Amino acid sequence: CKTAPNEHVSVTFAMNGTCANHALDMKDCNERGDLYAVTDLPIINNDNFADWVRGWCALSDNIVIWYYSLDTHVQAYTMLDVVYDDIMFFKECGVRGLFVEAETKGLGLQYVMTDIIYKMNWNPDMTEEEFDVTLDSILEQDFGEGWAYIREYLDGTLNKAQDIADQCWNCWGYMTL
C-alpha cells in the first residue's frame, strides 16, 4: 500500500486467510501464522488484514473487498457472529464494493449468511438490531414455522464458537493449529 492507483483503476483486495472466528478489527484474533504466497511477513492475523484495508482505502476510493466467507465442507460453523462487524469495518474504511465468495447451495446454512450480506449491501447503515430482525426474517422465509428452532441452533453454535474464542480458524473452514 505505497503507490496510489490511477483514479480509474479499481483495486480488488482478496481477504484470503483471515480468521473466521474473529472480526477483522476487534483485536480478538491472537493466532498468527504464515500466509503462503500473499506476504513475506512471517506472522499475520486479522489485525494485519485490517491494517492493509485501511492502507488501501487511504490510497484510493476504488477498493473492492473479496470477502471469503466460506463453509466449503459440511460444517456447523458460520461467520454470522463476525460478518456484521466486518462489513461495518469495510464501510467505515470507505470500501466501494464487496464480492462475497461463499457457498450458496447445498448443505449447511451458508446461503443464509450470503442472503444477509446481500441485504446489508442494500442497507449499509443497518444496526445490529436490524441485522437480527433481518436474520430472523430470512430464517422464517426459508424454514417456515420452524425458523425459531434454526435460530436457536445458530445462536447455540455461535455461543459455542465463542467458548473457544481463543481459537482461530481459517476462512476456508479449518482450524489454524
Question: What are the roles of these predicted feature ranges?
Answer:
Residues 1-136, 141-142, 155, 162, ...:
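Catalytic-core regions of glycoside hydrolase
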Residues 156-157, 168:
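Residue-level signal for alpha-helical context at structural boundaries
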Residues 149-153:
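Peripheral, non-AAA+ core regions of ATP-driven protein-machinery
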